[in-house]
């Protein structure tokens, strides 16, 4: 990585531009160029790329007056990456593409209308159960913090990894999973078909690592990521 050296014009850099991403370590900033692996994309990665291309194509068809609304709403949104000091904001295209991806994930792909980003209620997610049903891993999650919100508009969406009990995150595949129902249903269930083949798993006790967000079914937006790790013993 190349170290970034501050100057009188630019004191620091954050986020990504093109194939370069800024990383901060021990008070220093480094610029790392994104690697471009030679191996082909997985089927899931190729599908995700196609959705992204459709989102960008849809954005190009949005009238200029509507783009101005998206840009105005985007300036009110705190980015999901640092700095978290209100000194930076999203573009209207960022917000539009985020909503497009969200609706696609929820099974309702369409061109979204410009809507203000509503702050998500503070919430916490905890793994509370795990069972195997006809070769499917059914994970039960409890979601706290939505007691005074309309929980039916929020859906849990997570990237999950299963490894040997007690192990940290490794090279095992990550599986993206949308909950079987909204957060108004308790427990919230995330179901992984053929999970033993996905993770080459023979044990009934394992470590689950995850990154989860809430998706808002009204506007397609997503919350900040919550990371979790839990020991799961199948019942």
Task: For every predicted segment, state its role.
Residues 75-235:
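Charged linear interaction tracts used for macromolecular binding and regulation
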Residues 1-126:
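Long, polar/Ser/Thr-enriched low-complexity segments
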């Amino acid at each position: 990585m190349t170290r970034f050296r501050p100057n009188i014009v630019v004191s620091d850099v954050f986020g990504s531009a093109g194939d370069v991403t800024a990383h901060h370590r021990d008070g220093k900033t480094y610029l790392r160029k994104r690697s471009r692996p030679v191996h082909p994309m997985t089927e899931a990665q190729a599908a995700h790329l196609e959705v992204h291309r459709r989102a960008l194509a849809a954005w190009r068809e949005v009238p200029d007056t509507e783009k101005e609304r998206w840009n105005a709403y985007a300036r009110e949104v705190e980015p999901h990456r640092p700095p978290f000091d209100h000194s930076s904001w999203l573009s209207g295209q960022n917000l539009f593409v985020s909503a497009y991806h969200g609706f696609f994930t929820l099974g309702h792909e369409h061109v979204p209308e410009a809507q203000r980003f509503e702050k998500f209620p503070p919430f916490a997610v905890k793994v509370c159960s795990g069972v195997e049903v006809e070769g499917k891993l059914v994970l039960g999650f409890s979601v706290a913090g939505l007691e005074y919100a309309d929980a039916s508009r929020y859906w849990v969406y997570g990237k999950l990894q299963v490894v040997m009990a007690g192990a940290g995150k490794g090279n095992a595949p990550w599986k993206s999973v949308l909950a079987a129902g909204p957060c108004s249903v308790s427990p919230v269930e995330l179901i992984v078909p053929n999970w033993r083949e996905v993770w080459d798993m023979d044990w009934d006790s394992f470590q689950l690592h995850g990154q989860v967000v809430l998706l808002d079914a009204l506007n397609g937006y997503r919350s900040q990521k919550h990371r979790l790790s839990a020991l799961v013993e199948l019942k």
